[in-house]
Amino acid sequence: PQLMRNIADVNRQHETGRWLATNLGIETVSPPMVKKHLGVKTRPFATEEWGSVVREGAKILNENHWFPAATIIIGWPDETPEDSQATIDMMNDFRTMNFRGLVAPLLYQDFSEKNSMHFGNLNEAQFTLFWRCWENNLRVINDIIPIILRNKTYGPPMKIFMYGILKAGTWAIMRYLRGLCKDLFNGRTPDEIIEKYSRSRSVSSQKMITKKL
């Protein structure tokens, strides 16, 4: 935590209110999935602490004016609805703590096509997680604009173009997901699907912000 504060001080982020972007590879916070697929990534913390580490780490990044671009992997071959629920809980906690950052949900891809995840194979829990990620992105999209405007690599026309792409792209994805939901779940709407997973909580899920780094 202190290192992040020191870096923010060097960059004068607290003084100027300037936000910088960084990557955050979350992938999953389900303890069984973390233990099996993430391996040494969680060290020096235990695999079952990963969810709390991610929550606390995201909080520290935001407190020091860092805007994370995080990744989530959906559709591991051995993933259960309980595993998805653990990461859904994290997304719900992100919303509660007003997390500022993008979360990109990625479908699992394997060397074998039959083991890869496709949109048509999403179950209700996986769809809910995908939806929650893009709901988060729609919520924070305006936070990205100052980062783009400060980027000296792009001229004004390109900045305007990128802003339009971000807004239109996020809107188009949400619209696509609404249609996909009806196709996958017999005409049901996203609200009907996600309600079940918003009210419940994974039995293995950590409470929000329990691991002090």
Regions found by a protein language model. Name each.
Residues 125-213:
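Radical SAM enzyme core and accessory elements
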Residues 95-106, 115, 201-203, 207-213:
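Long amphipathic alpha-helical scaffold regions
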